[in-house]
Amino acid sequence: MHQAQSDLRRPLLILLAFLLTFPVSISATDERARERNAMVHEQIVARGIKDSTTLSAMRIVPRHLFVPVAQRPYAYQDRPLPIGYGQTISQPFMVAYMTELVSPGPGRKVLEIGTGSGYQAAILAASGAKVFTIEIIPQLAEAARERLDDLGYGGVAVRSADGFYGWAAEAPFDAIIVTAAAEFVPPPLIEQLAEGGLIVIPVGSPYFVQTLMLVQKRDGKPYSTSLMPVRFVPFTRATK
């Protein structure tokens, strides 16, 4: 009788051990998905972002995997977070806002200046765009390349270079997103923009509030519209 009870308990104990072990990761994954959905609903949709492609990408891409481990508890809060080397990952709303402005999608070719951790590039790729991204800090560029590849966004082309000069070999681009504040729009970026294309860029002093600008190329000339006050890290140039 004792042996029979023992035999019955054994599979139950094995099942209990399995349930105690594996749901931890599943539960954590579900919790992060809930956090992302809440982020989209409370921070992004509530502030007027409507593009379904952008919203879908924001729900899918795991922002917590694009920040240092110490910052992951705050990954789905509406604020920028430090990622090292004096750089930050933009707040979720700003990423969604800039993404919606350029309307990424299949067939669209988008250049990003300022890869950082790769989050904005992942959002653009998840929206269906063909993405090229430039990061001036080699360590960030390499880490972003590996991270994007590990998360299934290996199609994103990452390059370490001075973003001021764009990526002439891959031009023209349908859209260019700049994630650092420049004192003016770099002329090479305008040159590399397709006719009718858009540049989204924060313009102004790196020490004060800047203005997010939307630049459209029409008849070969740039036409700018001021959108909102913003604060971005400075546009870093290569030292001579």
What is each PLM-predicted segment?
Residues 26-111, 119-123, 127, 140-142, ...:
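Class I SAM-dependent transferase core
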